[in-house]
C-alpha cells in the first residue's frame, strides 16, 4: 500500500516526472549498441571506473600505449585528382557506399578527436596520424613532439598505392615506425567524451579490452543490405574458423579499438595469402578483410590477449534527423556529469541529409570541448 501511495503522490505532485519514469521503464531508451538502457549507463561507467582504480592500486606502471588515427581530406584538389584517375576503373566491383563522397568528406573532426585524446587521455605516449600526403591545417610544430604524421607510402607497399580503401590501410597499421606493442586505433569520427584511464583499454598484465556489440551479423545479412564491412567481417570469421572453434556473430561497437602489434604479425603469418588477395582493391569491395575492426580484436580474444569490456558509446549518423536530439543529449549529459565513454558521429551515406548537418556537428563539438 505504501508503494502505491508513493506512486499516487508522485503522480499528483510531479505528473511529468511520473509519466517520464513510467514510459522509460516500459519503453527503455537506448543510445548505444549494447543491451543497456540509458538509465543503466551512469552506473555501468561508475562501476568500470571503480574497478579500474582498484587494479591501478595493485599493479605497476602500464607499458607504453600509443594512439593511431587514419584521416583523409576529400576536399584536397591533389587527392581529388588522384581519386578521379583511379576510381572509375574500380567502381564496377566496389561495394555499397564505397564511392559515396560522405566517406571522404572532412568536417574537421580530427581536430576535436585528437585534442580530446590529449585532454582526456594524457597518459598516451604518442599519437600517429596516417594520411595520403596530407597535413591537417591546425597541426603545427608545437605538437610534433606528441604527434607524428605517417604517409601511406611509409607503411604500405608501393604496388598497392594509391589506395582509397580503409580496409587496405588498416592492414598495415603495425608497420608504423616506433609504434608501441599496445595501441588504440581511432577513426576520426570517434570522440572521447570523458576522462579515461589506461585500464579502460589495456590491463597492466597486457590484456586488452574488446568492446563487443549486441548486434548480429547474421541478422544484418538477413535484412539484405550487404555492406563491405559485413562481407569483410564474414570473410574474417571464415579465416578464424580455420584455427578456432568459434560461433562469432557479433561485430564490435563503433568506437576506438585496442590492438596489439604482435597480433597483427600473427595474422599476417597465418593469413598472408588471403591478405595479399584483397590488397589490390583500391576501393572497398565485398572480398576485403575487416582487419582492425574485427579480425585482429577477435584473434586477440581467442589467443587469450583480450577480454570483453563495456564501452558506453553513442553512435549516430550526422545526416540523420536523430542527430539533433543526440547532440542535445550529449551536452545535457555533460552538464549532469553523466557523459558516455565515447561517441561516434558517423558519416557514410550522402543520399539523404538534414540541413546544416555539418554546422550542427561543429557547433556541438565546440560547445562540448571548448578547446
UniProtKB/Swiss-Prot annotation:
Pfam families: Stealth_CR1, Stealth_CR2
Superkingdom to which the source organism belongs: Bacteria
A Gene Ontology BP annotation from the UniProt entry: polysaccharide biosynthetic process
Enzyme class: transferase
InterPro entries per record: Stealth (IPR047141), Stealth_CR1 (IPR031358), Stealth_CR2 (IPR021520)
E.C. numbers: 2.7.-.-
GO molecular function (one): transferase activity, transferring phosphorus-containing groups
Keywords: Exopolysaccharide synthesis, Transferase
Free-text function comment from the UniProt entry: Part of a capsular polysaccharide synthesis locus.
Family note: Belongs to the stealth family.
Entries under PANTHER family matching the protein: N-ACETYLGLUCOSAMINE-1-PHOSPHOTRANSFERASE SUBUNITS ALPHA_BETA, PTHR24045
Miscellaneous comment text of the record: Stealth proteins are part of a protein family that is conserved from bacteria to higher eukaryotes. Family members were first identified in microbes as proteins that help pathogens to elude the host innate immune system. Microbial stealth proteins are involved in the biosynthesis of exopolysaccharides. Stealth proteins are predicted to function as hexose-1-phosphoryltransferases.
Protein name: Capsular polysaccharide phosphotransferase cps12A
Biological source species: Actinobacillus pleuropneumoniae (Haemophilus pleuropneumoniae)
Gene: cps12A
Amino acid at each position: 500500500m505504501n508503494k502505491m501511495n508513493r506512486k499516487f503522490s508522485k503522480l499528483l505532485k510531479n505528473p511529468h516526472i511520473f509519466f517520464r519514469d513510467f514510459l522509460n521503464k516500459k519503453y527503455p531508451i537506448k543510445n548505444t549498441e549494447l543491451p543497456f538502457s540509458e538509465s543503466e549507463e551512469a552506473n555501468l561507467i561508475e562501476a568500470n571506473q571503480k574497478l579500474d582504480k582498484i587494479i591501478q592500486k595493485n599493479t605497476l606502471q602500464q607499458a607504453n600505449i600509443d594512439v593511431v588515427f587514419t584521416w583523409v581530406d576529400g576536399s584536397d584538389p591533389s587527392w581529388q585528382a588522384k581519386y578521379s584517375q583511379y576510381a572509375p576503373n574500380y567502381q564496377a566491383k566496389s561495394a555499397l557506399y564505397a564511392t559515396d563522397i560522405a566517406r571522404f568528406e572532412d568536417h574537421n573532426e580530427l581536430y576535436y578527436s585528437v585534442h580530446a585524446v590529449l585532454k582526456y587521455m594524457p597518459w598516451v605516449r604518442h599519437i600517429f596520424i596516417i594520411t595520403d600526403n596530407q597535413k591537417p591545417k591546425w597541426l603545427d610544430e608545437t605538437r610534433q613532439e606528441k604527434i607524428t604524421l605517417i604517409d601511406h607510402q611509409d607503411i604500405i607497399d608501393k604496388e598497392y598505392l594509391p589506395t582509397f580503401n580503409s580496409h587496405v590501410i588498416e592492414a598495415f597499421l603495425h608497420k608504423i615506425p616506433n609504434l608501441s606493442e599496445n595501441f588504440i586505433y581511432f577513426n576520426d569520427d570517434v570522440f572521447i567524451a570523458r576522462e579515461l584511464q589506461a585500464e579502460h583499454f589495456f590491463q597492466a598484465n597486457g590484456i586488452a579490452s574488446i568492446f563487443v556489440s549486441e548486434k548480429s551479423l547474421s541478422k544484418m545479412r538477413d535484412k539484405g543490405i550487404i555492406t563491405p564491412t559485413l562481407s569483410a567481417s564474414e570473410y574474417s570469421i571464415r579465416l578464424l574458423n580455420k584455427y578456432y572453434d568459434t560461433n562469432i556473430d557479433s561485430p564490435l561497437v563503433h568506437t576506438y579499438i585496442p590492438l596489439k602489434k604482435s597480433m597483427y604479425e600473427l595474422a599476417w603469418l597465418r593469413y598472408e595469402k588471403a591478405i595479399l588477395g584483397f590488397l589490390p582493391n583500391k576501393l572497398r569491395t565485398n572480398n576485403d578483410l575487416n582487419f582492425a575492426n574485427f579480425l585482429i580484436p577477435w584473434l586477440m580474444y581467442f589467443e587469450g590477449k583480450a577480454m570483453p569490456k563495456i564501452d558506453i558509446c553513442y553512435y549516430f549518423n550526422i545526416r540523420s534527423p536523430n542527430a539533433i536530439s543526440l547532440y542535445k543529449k550529449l551536452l545535457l549529459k555533460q552538464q549532469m556529469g553523466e557523459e558516455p565513454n565515447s561517441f561516434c558521429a558517423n558519416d557514410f551515406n550522402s543520399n539523404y541529409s538534414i540541413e546544416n548537418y555539418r554546422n550542427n556537428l561543429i557547433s556541438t563539438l565546440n560547445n562540448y570541448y571548448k578547446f
